[in-house]
């Protein structure tokens, strides 16, 4: 399942190329800070799409790994530089402990959009905030005590997310296209595969059956129906639990 936007990495310390000092920041970080300042200083509502694009570019720069076994840029930053980065990079949640990540802060961006954004921005970031859970995983996933995330089949979360993003694309087809299309594709992949459940096969069957009733014309509906048949006739072909 593609979770590119999460960028929560658990990186083994296989290599070390030396500390990066505070003044050696990637250009994308400065561009994000400038984009954020422009939004916060705006006297009239404006689109937050440039800010979102800048945030994703900064995220990529913070998590960039230059070579095999190397560390992410944020890991290589010296302690003074890291502390300054945390102070300067408002709107991001950063970690370089056991979990290494740099994630745009959903609550911060939602509040910003409600104050400064257009209707498309306000609606987008309301959904965006609900999309992430406390672990900065998509809400339809759970990590628990597992080494990898599982899918919360049977709880209705998948369908609620799918309905919300589908409606957003219907209302604002030109807005935030990269994120919305990828999010819908990820949700469709989850229901189409019907594996890696957090619970049991019955929860998968309930979720998939309800999904095709609620979204009979979804691009993934045929695949979901096939998976339901497979679960009934050959359940061991693709077990619902991931190890």
PLM regions: where:
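Acidic, polar-rich low-complexity tracts and alpha-helical solenoid repeat scaffolds
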Residues: 22-243
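Bacterial N-terminal signal peptides
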Residues: 8-17
